[in-house]
Amino acid sequence: MKPNFLLANLVCVLCLLTSCASPKVVERDASVHSAPIIHAQEFSQKYNMQLDFMKHHFSGMLIVRELPDNEIRILASTYFGLSLFDFSLRNEEFHVNSCIEPMKKKKILRLLETDFKNLFLNGKNIRIKKKNSTFEKRVRGSGFGKSVFYLSEFVSGYPEQIKIKHPWLRLSIQLDKLKEKQD
C-alpha cells in the first residue's frame, strides 16, 4: 500500500507542477545579417578615435578609404603621427600591414578583424538588442569574443558616433565622425 501511496503523490505533484504554469513565449533576439555600419567610399572618411586597451589609452584619427580595386584601407594614427595600425579588407580577407606592439597579439588582431568586418562589410550573426530612431545596440559573439556596438546620432542612415566594447578584455574603441568643411 505504501508504494501505491508514494506513486499517487508523485503523480499528483507532477500534475500540479506541469499543469498550473501559463505558457511563456521567450522572445529571443534574432541573429541577422546586417548591412555595413560604415559605407567605405572613394574619398577618405575621417573619425576621431579613442582606443582603450587594458592600461593603454590612445587618441587619434581613423581614416577609411575604399581603393579602386575594392580594397578598404583602415589606418589609425595618433594626432602626433604615430601609426597605431594599418589594415586592409578585400572581400572577406583581412590583412595586417602594420600594428603597434601592445596590440600585436593573435587574439586581439582576430577581434579587431571581426570588428572591422562588421563595420565595413555585411555583418554576420549580429543580434540587434535595441533600436530606435536615435540609438542602436548590436551584439556579436559571446564570452571573450563578445563585441557590443553602440550606434547613435544617425545622419542619412549611417551613425555619426560608434562605440565598440569588448567587456571581458577591457578593449573599447570610440569613433566620432569628423564633419567635412563646407567652403
What are these regions (language model features)?
Residues 16-19:
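C-terminal motif of bacterial Sec signal peptides marking the signal peptidase cleavage site
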Residues 21-25, 48-49, 94-96, 102-183:
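Mature, soluble, non-transmembrane domains
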Residues 73-106:
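Mid-chain, structured segments of secreted extracytoplasmic proteins
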Residues 1-10:
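Bacterial N-terminal signal peptides that target proteins for export
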Residues 44, 69-71, 82, 91, ...:
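Extracytoplasmic
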Residues 25-34:
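Short, low-complexity, disordered segments immediately C-terminal to signal peptides
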Residues 40-73:
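Post-signal-peptide N-terminal segment of Sec-exported extracytoplasmic proteins
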